[in-house]
Amino acid sequence: MINLGDKQSTIVVAMSGGVDSSAVAAMLHEQGHNVIGITLQLYDHGMAVGKKNACCAGQDIYDAKMVANKLGIPHYVLDYESKFKESVIDNFVDSYLQGETPLPCVQCNKSVKFRDLIKTARELGADKLATGHYVRKINGDNGAELHTGLDPAKDQSYFLFTTTKEQLEYLRFPLGGLTKDETRKLASKFGLEVADKPDSQDICFIPDGNYKSVINKIRPNSSESGKIIHVNGFELGEHSGIINYTIGQRRGLGIAYNEPLYVVKIDPKDNVVYVGPESALNVQEFIIRDVNWLADEIKDNEKLEVAVKIRSTRPPRLAEISKFGDDKMKVKFLCEEKAVAPGQACVIYAGARVLGGGWITREIR
């Protein structure tokens, strides 16, 4: 059994209704902690009640309450729909309209799940907030550090780079040293019916996978057609709205040409989609904004060799970073990388430790 090293205390567990957070609640309850389960209703969950493998659906709320009842712990469902729409859904829609590729799970962790839920946990008198994320919190010489989960296949550190130092001190991640199989075995040991429940796969507020319908519902008439232009300057055709395209996309362009073409750049101001050969996707350096830094302070223009991830599914790449201004950094790859997309996150690592990260801007070269 994993022990958090804490004395018996009051811990709020963010219970999504899945196996991970359910196992966390059971584990902490067995260790003698005063556990309070909280499940967030984040959107019109009626849309997804019948949808399998979607997070935060009505079934998930039911499952979380069922687990809490089995453990004999208090459980609350909090209506965060308005907070979620303002902080996550509206941001998601506006990001697409700006020609970006958004990352709503990071925005959700940053705002609703950590900022707002930590505030609620403190109001309930809780000493800590525990989640089912596969990351590790390690106490270093200068305070808490965020590290990758031991299981590379389940590591979620990329999605938690916006966690602040203050939040990290309050948070607990009991599953960071486990594999998914070990978590399921733990849930089975506790007799939890969700032990074999499938992982969520979809963006929770898009249960059918059709993000364009969500955008058009919130921002009607957002699919304005425009020009598709080759990076060499000549026009190739017409696009159906920039929300339908992302950097690196090859399929669905509707263009006949003598070589494969990829989306290289999206210009929301002029409503233009630029395409080119695969080589045009190569990137040497770019700028990130709204940097959240968790390590020792670095000076302006000081260069640091690190590893960076620009997509959750891509392996880390060696790069050199340098800070300028209050919240920006230049990231320069040691070897060129393909398809760096504005709106995605760039997360910075030193080995297993998350040093920080920021949002990729259009300043890409």
From Swiss-Prot:
<dbReference type="GO" id="GO:0000049">
    <property type="term" value="F:tRNA binding"/>
</dbReference>
<keyword id="KW-0820">tRNA-binding</keyword>
<keyword id="KW-1015">Disulfide bond</keyword>
<keyword id="KW-0694">RNA-binding</keyword>
<comment type="function">
    <text>Catalyzes the 2-thiolation of uridine at the wobble position (U34) of tRNA, leading to the formation of s(2)U34.</text>
</comment>
<dbReference type="Pfam" id="PF03054">
    <property type="entry name" value="tRNA_Me_trans"/>
</dbReference>
<feature type="site" description="Interaction with tRNA">
    <location>
        <position position="344"/>
    </location>
</feature>
<dbReference type="InterPro" id="IPR046884">
    <property type="entry name" value="MnmA-like_central"/>
</dbReference>
<keyword id="KW-0808">Transferase</keyword>
<feature type="binding site">
    <location>
        <position position="132"/>
    </location>
    <ligand>
        <name>ATP</name>
    </ligand>
</feature>
<feature type="region of interest" description="Interaction with tRNA">
    <location>
        <begin position="154"/>
        <end position="156"/>
    </location>
</feature>
<dbReference type="InterPro" id="IPR023382">
    <property type="entry name" value="MnmA-like_central_sf"/>
</dbReference>
<dbReference type="GO" id="GO:0002143">
    <property type="term" value="P:tRNA wobble position uridine thiolation"/>
</dbReference>
<dbReference type="Pfam" id="PF20259">
    <property type="entry name" value="tRNA_Me_trans_M"/>
</dbReference>
<keyword id="KW-0819">tRNA processing</keyword>
<feature type="active site" description="Nucleophile">
    <location>
        <position position="108"/>
    </location>
</feature>
<comment type="similarity">
    <text>Belongs to the MnmA/TRMU family.</text>
</comment>
<dbReference type="InterPro" id="IPR004506">
    <property type="entry name" value="MnmA-like"/>
</dbReference>
<feature type="site" description="Interaction with tRNA">
    <location>
        <position position="133"/>
    </location>
</feature>
<dbReference type="InterPro" id="IPR046885">
    <property type="entry name" value="MnmA-like_C"/>
</dbReference>
<dbReference type="Pfam" id="PF20258">
    <property type="entry name" value="tRNA_Me_trans_C"/>
</dbReference>
<feature type="binding site">
    <location>
        <begin position="14"/>
        <end position="21"/>
    </location>
    <ligand>
        <name>ATP</name>
    </ligand>
</feature>
<dbReference type="GO" id="GO:0103016">
    <property type="term" value="F:tRNA-uridine 2-sulfurtransferase activity"/>
</dbReference>
<keyword id="KW-0547">Nucleotide-binding</keyword>
<keyword id="KW-0067">ATP-binding</keyword>
<dbReference type="GO" id="GO:0005524">
    <property type="term" value="F:ATP binding"/>
</dbReference>
<keyword id="KW-0963">Cytoplasm</keyword>
<protein>
    <recommendedName>
        <fullName>tRNA-specific 2-thiouridylase MnmA</fullName>
        <ecNumber>2.8.1.13</ecNumber>
    </recommendedName>
</protein>
<feature type="binding site">
    <location>
        <position position="40"/>
    </location>
    <ligand>
        <name>ATP</name>
    </ligand>
</feature>
<feature type="active site" description="Cysteine persulfide intermediate">
    <location>
        <position position="204"/>
    </location>
</feature>
<feature type="disulfide bond" description="Alternate">
    <location>
        <begin position="108"/>
        <end position="204"/>
    </location>
</feature>
<dbReference type="GO" id="GO:0005737">
    <property type="term" value="C:cytoplasm"/>
</dbReference>
<dbReference type="InterPro" id="IPR014729">
    <property type="entry name" value="Rossmann-like_a/b/a_fold"/>
</dbReference>
